[in-house]
Amino acid sequence: MVPPTVEASLESPYTKSYFSPVPSALLEQNDSPIIMGIDEAGRGPVLGPMVYAVAYSTQKYQDETIIPNYEFDDSKKLTDPIRRMLFSKIYQDNEELTQIGYATTCITPLDISRGMSKFPPTRNYNLNEQAHDVTMALIDGVIKQNVKLSHVYVDTVGPPASYQKKLEQRFPGVKFTVAKKADSLYCMVSVASVVAKVTRDILVESLKRDPDEILGSGYPSDPKTVAWLKRNQTSLMGWPANMVRFSWQTCQTLLDDASKNSIPIKWEEQYMDSRKNAAQKTKQLQLQMVAKPVRRKRLRTLDNWYR
């Protein structure tokens, strides 16, 4: 069974979000505060989406059910089968982890690149800004489902103190803890980490044209990923925009290196400007060729008037 977080984003080149139904136990209870964890997967790779996930439950359910019985941790420390098994216990109707709600936003390579490549550069929508906005939209979406959040734990993007202040100002009344390595420190962040990682991994797999295709880890430092980029680079458009983040320096370098074998593209504005400049130069040259020398007027005086 494909996770609903994946189904919501399959085949779309644009950013999509998914919000699970709120577990009825969370809407009915008042005896334990509701806590949330937030984490991402895929911030650094040149391939595939960046996925943000939130997971929430009651403090009591976390302490009495999740922590004693399930091995949630930083998703990078878990094997792929373990991650998928843990997430399946949340989204499948198997009567296991029934009191965990979750939501995801998959920021596609197209939207990441578009945000980071605006002109002029002062208008760039950098990755931190995109991450902050998506995080706040996810929190807001859960609150709009009538979930009364008490405490939110966030794996940091940028300096923890300034980010925490930003979140507290946006959501007064909700307590925030923003920390580095939060996915190893707080259980609900670990749950969110697993949700984000599994969702991203399956989405990246879906991008393969051949099941045996080797993409590598997706990171620009991975020789297998760089080899895939070189192998699949086309002379006109580079790579599919739904797979590759063109704003990454790795892509810029490969495009520049291949410029001799690539098809040059001139935008209409550039073409019109070049024609206008050429016409102006031609006109100036013609004026220079046909211009007649200016005759100086003879100075008339009265020197010889009486002779």
From Swiss-Prot:
It catalyses: Endonucleolytic cleavage to 5'-phosphomonoester. GO terms for cellular component: cytoplasm; nucleus; ribonuclease H2 complex. GO terms for molecular function: metal ion binding; RNA binding; RNA-DNA hybrid ribonuclease activity. Its cofactor is Mn(2+); Mg(2+). Its main location: cytoplasm. Keywords: Cytoplasm, Endonuclease, Hydrolase, Metal-binding, Nuclease, Nucleus. InterPro entries: RNase_H2_suA, RNase_HII/HIII, RNase_HII/HIII_dom, RNase_HII_hlx-loop-hlx_cap_dom, RNaseH-like_sf, RNaseH_sf. Manganese or magnesium. Binds 1 divalent metal ion per monomer in the absence of substrate. May bind a second metal ion after substrate binding. Belongs to the RNase HII family. Eukaryotic subfamily. This is Ribonuclease H2 subunit A. It comes from Saccharomyces cerevisiae (strain ATCC 204508 / S288c) (Baker's yeast). The gene is RNH201.
